[in-house]
């Protein structure tokens, strides 16, 4: 198991004088040299790696790399569990580690934990304890072995969900018998922008300057068109290793902007997987010395914003005659447009302008193959008479628990009045 290595920002790689000298490793390059680890102790996993220790310019061995990549699996049953939760802004991810006595397979085997909520904006100083409830487990691509990442949600000591715990309500929605019977699928397209550290300007752009107009950068290759591919690829592999249901990646329309897709995932799993994928991306950009932003419009002007398009279907939508079910769902979504917009991410009004492949934030629309609509239906869905819809309104900084839960609630549990339904159907030219 090869771990993702950070670019080395504190040392340069050179061989000693009696060997061939190679060019130095800068902070923008990945330290990607590995040797298979030969241990005399009995191995508990099939493949192990360690970083190649090289001499720095002063001749000292970089022991930290050896320790960071040390696989302790052959020597102890204990594992490291990284407890991850969402902080006080509703978009920041926090984590801390603890030792668990043996490998686990289910969150119920893990203990609850606590943290200082006054330091994350989630509790007052005189009553600062917030309790972490383990909810989902993923393999840890940084530590390897049997070590794990644990997605948690947050509660008061009395067992009440705190205000930033959006998972709790989503879990209630997805536990409803009607929702369970419809087996809701979600495919989430997470866009993000990579920024140069300390200058708050996109990766690959001259500081304070602008590249050529949009057009050459989407899904492009080349040093003058693609910036940050190493980060995107490292993240892709880390997600696959972790067990995240990642389904693809691509470079986006604005240079320095990327996207990854997660799904199809069922119910609450969609939110768990997106949050874990975001955590991995934060860790990888941290190692790379690059800043990750989920701002929906990081650069003003004639540049695309960053969204989190959410593809959605139910069992009824995927079966014969499903297009009629999709149209009924679109009708319901139109009637709750304001409720959805208010929950679809902060600063989304800067992105949803009606330009740059977006609909206006003030009006609801739908169309087939139209990326300027609120809800897009694909050509294949129209042709086959069944499939899914794409909600193009969510911003890149949306909470996936909120968005997925709201989609299920509006389309499966909420019923409009007959009068409102008729008026909306007429306005949207929907015969339902």
Swiss-Prot record:
The keyword ATP-binding applies. Residues 166-432 form the GS catalytic domain. GO terms for cellular component: chloroplast. One of its GO terms (molecular function) is ATP binding. Disulfide bonds: none annotated. Coiled coil: none annotated. InterPro entries: Gln_synt_N, Gln_synt_N_sf, Gln_synth/guanido_kin_cat_dom, Gln_synth_cat_dom, Gln_synth_gly_rich_site, Gln_synth_N_conserv_site, Glutamine_Synthetase. The keyword Transmembrane helix does not apply. It comes from the Eukaryota. Keywords: ATP-binding, Chloroplast, Ligase, Nucleotide-binding, Plastid, Transit peptide. SUPFAM superfamilies: Glutamine synthetase, N-terminal domain, Glutamine synthetase/guanido kinase. Residues 79-159 form the GS beta-grasp domain. One of its GO terms (biological process) is glutamine biosynthetic process. Its EC number is 6.3.1.2. SMART domains: Gln-synt_C. Pfam families: Gln-synt_C (PF00120), Gln-synt_N (PF03951). It is found in: Plastid, Chloroplast. It catalyses: L-glutamate + NH4(+) + ATP = L-glutamine + ADP + phosphate + H(+). Its main location: plastid. The light-modulated chloroplast enzyme, encoded by a nuclear gene and expressed primarily in leaves, is responsible for the reassimilation of the ammonia generated by photorespiration. Belongs to the glutamine synthetase family. Homooctamer. This is Glutamine synthetase, chloroplastic. It comes from Daucus carota (Wild carrot).
């Amino acid at each position: 198991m090869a771990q993702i290595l950070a670019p080395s920002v504190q040392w340069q790689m050179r061989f000693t004088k009696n060997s061939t000298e190679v060019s130095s490793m800068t902070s923008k390059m990945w330290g990607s040299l590995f040797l298979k680890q030969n241990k005399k102790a009995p191995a508990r996993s099939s493949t192990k790696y360690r970083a190649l220790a090289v001499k720095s310019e002063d001749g000292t061995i970089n022991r930290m790399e050896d320790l960071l990549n040390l696989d302790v699996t052959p020597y102890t049953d204990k594992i490291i569990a990284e407890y991850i939760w969402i902080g006080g802004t509703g978009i920041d991810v926090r984590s801390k580690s603890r030792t668990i006595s043996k490998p686990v397979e289910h969150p119920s085997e893990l203990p609850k934990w606590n943290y200082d909520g006054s330091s994350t904006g989630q509790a007052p100083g005189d009553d600062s304890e917030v309790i972490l409830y383990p909810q989902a487990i993923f393999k840890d691509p940084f530590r390897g072995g049997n070590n794990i990442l644990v997605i948690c949600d947050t509660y008061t000591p009395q067992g009440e969900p705190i205000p930033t715990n959006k998972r709790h309500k989503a879990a209630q929605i997805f536990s409803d018998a009607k929702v369970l019977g419809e087996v809701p699928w979600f495919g989430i397209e997470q866009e993000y922008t990579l920024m140069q550290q300390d200058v708050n300007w996109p990766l690959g752009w001259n500081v304070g300057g602008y590249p050529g107009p949009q057009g050459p950068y989407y899904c492009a290759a080349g040093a003058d068109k693609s910036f940050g591919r190493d980060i995107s690829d490292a993240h892709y592999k880390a997600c696959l290793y972790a067990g995240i249901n990642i389904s693809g990646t691509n470079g986006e329309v604005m240079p320095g902007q990327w996207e990854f897709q997660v799904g199809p995932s069922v119910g609450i799993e969609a939110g768990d997987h997106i949050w874990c994928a975001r955590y991995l991306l934060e860790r990888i950009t941290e190692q790379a010395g690059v800043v990750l932003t989920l701002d929906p419009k990081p650069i003003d002007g004639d540049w695309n914003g960053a969204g989190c398009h959410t593809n959605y279907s139910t069992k009824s939508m995927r079966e014969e005659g499903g297009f009629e079910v999709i149209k009924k769902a679109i009708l319901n979504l139109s009637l709750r447009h304001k409720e959805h917009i208010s929950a679809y991410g902060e600063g989304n009004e800067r992105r949803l302008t009606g330009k740059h492949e977006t609909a206006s934030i003030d009006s609801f629309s739908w169309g087939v193959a139209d990326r300027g609509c609120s809800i897009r239906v694909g050509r294949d869905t129209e042709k086959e008479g069944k499939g899914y819809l794409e909600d193009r309104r969510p911003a890149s900084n949306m909470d996936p628990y909120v968005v997925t839960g709201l989609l299920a609630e509006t389309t499966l549990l909420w019923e409009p009045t007959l009068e409102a339904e008729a008026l909306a159907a007429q306005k949207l030219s929907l015969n339902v």
